């Protein structure tokens, strides 16, 4: 973390998400209570810490299961939502089995594409509502949807219909707050 806030990763290929395990450190220590010798004390304890970890996690599968549980838990999801607006946005969506949902939309045609028929327009409305000032362009948003849907155990699917992209996404009633 930096300044007791989680670091923000914008990498969209999934490499960070597959490896990232989030630990929160939000108990801020005042300057008067900070131990100036803490780094040296921790360095002296590293061999003991390693022995303890090896003893507690002699079975690597148990350690792996605990890390996966933490990585995929509610607290980790909340942090992912705070750091990635596309992941936050996906909580307001339903993912269908087939690409028979909203059209992707985008471009400059605001008459043809509205928040009722365009996933990208819904995303832009969400970004404005959430006070997020840097929305992704249509292509980057579409790429970001696949890993964001996976965070919720869903799959993002698209298909081409008459030269347009149709998604497997519909909005939930929770979207009414920003539509």
Give residue ranges: language-model regions.
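Feature primarily recognizes SF3-like P-loop helicase cores of small DNA viruses
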Residues: 1-179
């Amino acid at each position: 973390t930096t300044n007791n806030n989680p670091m923000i990763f914008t990498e969209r290929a999934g490499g960070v998400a597959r490896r990232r395990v989030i630990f929160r450190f939000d108990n801020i220590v005042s300057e008067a209570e900070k131990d100036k010798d803490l780094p040296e004390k921790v360095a002296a304890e590293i061999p003991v810490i390693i022995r303890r970890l090896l003893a507690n996690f002699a079975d690597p599968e148990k350690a792996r299961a605990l890390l996966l549980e933490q990585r995929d838990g509610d607290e980790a999801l909340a942090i992912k939502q705070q750091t990635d607006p596309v992941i936050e946005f996906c909580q307001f969506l339903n993912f269908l089995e087939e690409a028979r949902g909203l059209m992707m939309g985008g471009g400059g045609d605001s008459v043809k594409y509205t928040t009722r028929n365009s996933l990208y327009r819904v995303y832009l409305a969400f970004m404005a509502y959430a006070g997020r000032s840097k929305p992704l362009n249509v292509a980057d948003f579409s790429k970001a949807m696949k890993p964001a849907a996976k965070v919720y155990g869903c799959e993002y699917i698209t298909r081409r219909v008459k030269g347009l992209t149709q998604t497997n996404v519909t909005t939930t009633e929770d979207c009414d707050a920003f539509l």
